[in-house]
Amino acid sequence: GTFFSDTSALIGNEVATFPYYPAEIRPPHNTIAGVSGFQVNTGANVKTSGDLCDILVCMNPASLAANINNAKIGATLVVDNSLFEEKIYEKAKFKSNPLTDGSLSNYNLIAANFSEIVKESCKDLGLDVKSVDRTRNLFGLGIVLYLCDYDLMVTLKLLEKKFKSKPQILEANKAVLKTGFFYAEALELQISKIHVSSAEIEKGKYRN
């Protein structure tokens, strides 16, 4: 969320964000009570963090269950399907797998196994399993950048700035971000890209 909002700002958009955190301090694993998120509204004349979303990124069944009602009909859902096993999606109150039972037919669904894809992207970088798994968000971000028709290079430069002292982590994040972007491109989606209008910003000095 932070990289997306920073990218939006750098290409000339107004940005409003709203991070939210689990409803419980130590909620049961893979339950709705444990869901956190980061909402971004970007474009011209942005006044609030937004209402219903055009793109929803979900990393697990609980995230989908908690947020699906916040997505517009016809919105694009970007979902990591690696945890959509029966025992896990039932914890999120789904009676069947929502990715395959037709219940999401009113949305544009992009479902992929983020975990396996990032492992492949990082296989030659010598990173431990936990570090590789942490790059999953960057795969989702790459897809979102493509859907919003954003310049990939802007986000890559942000990564270089943040992780310049950690070259292995930097290379992993860059590789996974590119993989997500080109994954979406290769799908040849019958989905219109979202055009985000740039804000008219007065001349002056600004700090991010």
Regions flagged by a language model, labelled:
Residues 1-208:
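Active-site cofactor/cluster-binding pocket
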